[in-house]
Amino acid sequence: MLRHAFALEVKEGRTSEFRGNLGKIWPELTAFLDAKKMVNFSMWNVERIVFGYYETEDDFVFTDADKETVKAWEGSYGDAYTWVSTPFEEMRLMYHDFGIVRESKELIRHRVFITKLVPGAEDEYKARHDVLVEARGGKVTEGPDSNFSIWNAGGYIFGYNEIDTTMERDRTEEDRQGDIAWET
């Protein structure tokens, strides 16, 4: 399975227009996703920043015809948004811990985040997270976090995490202090 992400910024005062236009193309979009076997497609927003995520089979590529279809949809949007990521190009993967991907999403809760990085901090952020990936030594994480990825484009990081709710536990003060130490 391949994982993909994209990001947009809705122009000031145009959120209703953006959502309305998305609703107009939704039946066509979902048919396209089904035909291309693009699954687990989701979009979230924090204020005007929109983060999208989807999964495909390993041999997935956008054909020229696919790109033209997407461009036609964009035409129906007018200029309600601008791209944060580059269309049809992979966003930079900053971190991954794919763990065990649950086929059933019924007991999954999602954690999604969008954060503006300090200018020029992308490489340091990636290096810190590469240490975590290396420390796992290829070991599969059983949970509760699974299918966790952090992407980068336009000075932002975008996180997607599926959390198995049957494996969650109450966080301790030690957990919180560890988070603070990691983040600062």
Give residue spans per PLM region.
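Short, structured motif recognition centered on aromatic/hydrophobic residues
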Residues: 5, 26, 112-114, 157-160
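Tryptophan-centric aromatic hotspots in well-structured domains and transmembrane helices
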Residues: 22, 73, 133, 148, ...
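Glycine-rich beta-strand-turn "strand-cap" elements at beta-sheet edges
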Residues: 41-48, 70-108, 151-153, 183-184
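Short, glycine- and small/hydrophobic-rich beta-strand elements in well-ordered beta-sheets
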Residues: 27-51, 55-56, 137-166
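Short amphipathic alpha-helical segments
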Residues: 14-37, 121-145
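An amphipathic, aromatic/His-enriched active-site/gating alpha helix that lines ligand/cofactor pockets
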Residues: 32-39, 56-89, 143, 163-184
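Short glycine-/aliphatic-rich beta-strand segments at the starts of folded cytosolic domains
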Residues: 1-18, 108-123
